[in-house]
């Protein structure tokens, strides 16, 4: 075969050996190194010999492994609850457009742009007003805002353009105020600007506006007019300036300004009544603006050159002076008497009526809306639970029901008896009443006891429905006793003490046959029966003939010798009285008479006599009564005598056997038989 056909045997695969867990000895390690194969490549991972120990999963190891950023942070303070005024703030924000419209109207019809008069004599009035304003400032300490409103700034600027030049100190103050106003205006929100504009208008309103009546601008004009008229009267005729001409123009044409103010008031009333929330916001901020105006006047310098600011303070803060008078109770006397304006008075009287009508209409609308809401049915969230049925009253027991019926019957009977007795007593005569007083007293007692019906335990009471007979006799009248016959009384006495009750058991069921067939035992206590029976009997079957046949002559001779030796005690015994001999039968007496004659001839004739004595005793015991037999038994000593005789006979027989006194064998045998029979 060629080499190509021969198969190639593969090499045997070599086993890889892992490192031992425990170190081997030197010889073993050398053998392993010699036979070891090349080591495995370094790229394969080394399998650890031991399993790594698990770390305890405690809280410390858990916290150390986690990042601090992943854990939630607990807030230091509890979140503050949102205030309840948040809804009101939302309402104010929604009405910002309407407030802007009101602000534009106020800026168009602003009264503060009217030029005011300046005179050196009006400085004193400004000082008086400043004194009252200082007193009012002490009452409102919490209002510390000192920045002037933008409307007042415009007012001062208009006065500067038309009147004399202002001193440099006023310019410095104005520049400072403008800087502060500019910085504050940047911080204010739109809402705060609107409120500031409303505050400026509210600061110039009178006490009538505080009562929710808008359009008080006319009152301010009247007050300022009175003040200017007083100042004109105080001026000298020579010192007339341009400001005086302007003031005269203002006083000469008051009607045109009044018409414009009335129109403005009507427009403002309509808007405010349409949005009452805006009016409330303006009235609430009225007091704040008054405090700001007071601070402005005090912050400005008071001197002969600053007469313009003093006049503005007196004209704008007349309501504040009235309030300060009410607080401090210090009256202020004006220099000129105010003139009465009939048109303003009429308008003031008409305004409250219109306001009351509108307020009443609003109240009616609110009431109608609440009534409509109340009429609308509301679906409850949860279904109402059904009420449980009323508890059924328990039925009274039979005893309670019977007791209630009994009481009702008694009450009805008592009512009938009382009605009948009242009719009879009215018809009875007075004489009969005196005679029958004792009888009626007895009947009333009986009625009283019958009403009790055993409710109270009386002595001797057995049945609650009946009274004892002794008590009935005492309480019953003599007429009732006479009416009752002897038979009725006997029946009443022999009545049952208590009602028989039926035994409790299964109703409507028959008893088992074993129980039903049992006869009842009836005990009769009145009958007595006597029975006589014999307790014991004595019978003797030993006869005289039988003894004679059994005994031999040799035995008879031996017995005779024994009896002779014992003759002395027998004679004594015969001499002692014996009661048993008197009870012997007559045939035994005949035998006893015959025996003594034969006894002398035959000495063995005494044995039958002993037997006859036993027979006599048996006969006598049968004839005697039990008590007599017991007495004779105690006195009889026959049993003891017989025992003594037997013992003596046995001793004699023993002596004969030991001595060998028998002559023949026959005599010895006969003696043994005799001893056996004697036993």
From Swiss-Prot:
UniProt-annotated location(s): Cytoplasm, Cytoskeleton, Actin patch
Major subcellular location class: cytoplasm
Q: Which portions of the chain have biased composition (kind: Basic and acidic residues)?
A: 9-19, 179-213, 243-272, 339-361, 372-383, 471-482, 556-576, 667-679
Q: Which residues carry this modification: Phosphothreonine?
A: 18, 58, 85, 277, 552
The segment annotated Interaction with SH3 domain of ABP1 runs over 383-396
Question: What does the record give as the function of this protein?
Answer: Involved in mitochondrial migration along actin filaments.
Q: What is this protein called?
A: Altered inheritance of mitochondria protein 21
Traced from the root, the source organism's taxonomic lineage reads: Eukaryota, Fungi, Dikarya, Ascomycota, Saccharomycotina
Q: Which gene encodes it?
A: AIM21
């Amino acid at each position: 075969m060629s080499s190509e056909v021969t198969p190639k045997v593969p090499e045997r695969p070599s086993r890889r050996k892992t490192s031992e867990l425990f170190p081997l000895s030197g010889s073993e390690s050398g053998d392993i190194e010699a036979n070891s194969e090349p080591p495995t490549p370094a790229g394969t991972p080394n399998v650890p010999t031991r399993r790594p120990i698990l770390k305890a999963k405690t809280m410390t190891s858990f916290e150390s492994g986690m990042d601090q950023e992943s854990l939630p942070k607990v807030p230091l303070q509890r979140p503050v609850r949102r205030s309840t005024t948040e809804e009101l703030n939302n309402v104010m924000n929604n009405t910002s457009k309407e407030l802007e419209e009101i602000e534009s109207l106020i800026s168009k019809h602003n009264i503060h742009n009217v030029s005011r008069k300046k005179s050196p004599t009006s400085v004193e009035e400004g000082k008086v007003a400043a004194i009252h304003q200082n007193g009012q400032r002490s009452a409102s300490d919490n209002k510390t805002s000192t920045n002037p409103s933008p409307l007042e700034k415009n007012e001062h600027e208009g006065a500067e353009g038309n009147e004399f030049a202002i001193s440099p100190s006023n310019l410095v103050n104005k520049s400072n105020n403008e800087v502060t106003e500019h910085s504050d205006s940047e911080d204010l929100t739109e809402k705060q600007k609107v409120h500031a504009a409303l505050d400026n208008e509210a600061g110039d309103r009178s006490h009538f506006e505080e009562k929710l009546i808008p359009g008080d601008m006319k009152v301010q004009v009247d007050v300022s007019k009175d003040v200017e008229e007083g100042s004109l009267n105080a001026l000298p005729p020579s010192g007339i300036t341009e400001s005086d001409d302007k003031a005269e123009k203002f006083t000469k044409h008051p009607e045109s300004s009044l018409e414009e103010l009335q129109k403005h008031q009507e427009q403002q009333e309509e808007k405010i009544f349409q949005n009452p929330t805006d009016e409330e916001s303006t009235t609430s901020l009225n007091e704040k603006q008054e405090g700001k105006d007071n601070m402005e006047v005090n912050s400005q310098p008071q001197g002969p050159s600053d007469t313009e600011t003093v006049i503005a303070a007196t004209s704008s803060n007349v309501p504040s002076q009235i309030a300060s008078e009410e607080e401090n109770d210090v009256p202020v006397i004006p220099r000129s008497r105010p003139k009465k304006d009939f048109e303003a008075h009429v308008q003031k009287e008409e305004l409250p009526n219109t306001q009351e009508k509108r307020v009443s209409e609003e109240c009616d609308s609110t009431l109608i809306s609440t009534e409509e809401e109340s009429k609308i049915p509301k679906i409850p969230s949860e279904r109402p639970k059904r009420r449980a049925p009323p508890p059924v009253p328990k039925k009274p027991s039979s005893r309670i029901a019977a007791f209630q019926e009994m009481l009702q019957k008694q009450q009805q009977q008592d009512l009938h008896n009382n009605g009948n007795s009242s009719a009879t007593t009215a018809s009875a005569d007075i004489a009969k009443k005196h005679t029958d007083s004792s009888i009626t007293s007895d009947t009333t007692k009986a009625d009283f006891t019958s009403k009790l019906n055993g409710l109270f335990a009386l002595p001797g009471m057995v049945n609650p429905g009946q009274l004892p007979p002794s008590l009935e006799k005492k309480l019953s009248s003599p007429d009732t006793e006479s009416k009752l016959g002897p038979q009725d009384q006997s029946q009443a006495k022999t009545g049952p003490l208590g009602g028989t009750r039926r035994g409790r058991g299964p109703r409507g069921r028959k008893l088992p046959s074993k129980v039903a067939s049992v006869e009842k035992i009836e005990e009769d206590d009145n009958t007595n029966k006597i029975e006589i029976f014999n307790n014991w009997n004595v019978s003797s079957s030993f006869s005289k003939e039988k003894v004679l046949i059994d005994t031999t002559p040799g035995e008879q001779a031996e017995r005779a010798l024994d009896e002779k030796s014992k003759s002395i005690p027998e004679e004594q015994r015969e001499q002692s009285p014996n009661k048993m001999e008197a009870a012997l039968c007559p045939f035994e007496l005949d035998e006893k008479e015959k025996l003594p004659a034969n006894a002398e001839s035959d000495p063995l004739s005494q044995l039958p006599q002993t037997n006859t004595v036993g027979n006599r005793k048996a006969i006598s015991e049968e004839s005697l009564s039990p008590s007599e037999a017991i007495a004779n038994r105690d006195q009889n000593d026959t049993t003891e005598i017989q025992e003594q005789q037997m013992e003596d006979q046995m001793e004699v027989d023993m002596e004969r056997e030991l001595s060998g006194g028998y002559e023949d064998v026959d005599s010895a045998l006969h003696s043994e038989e005799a001893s056996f029979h004697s036993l």
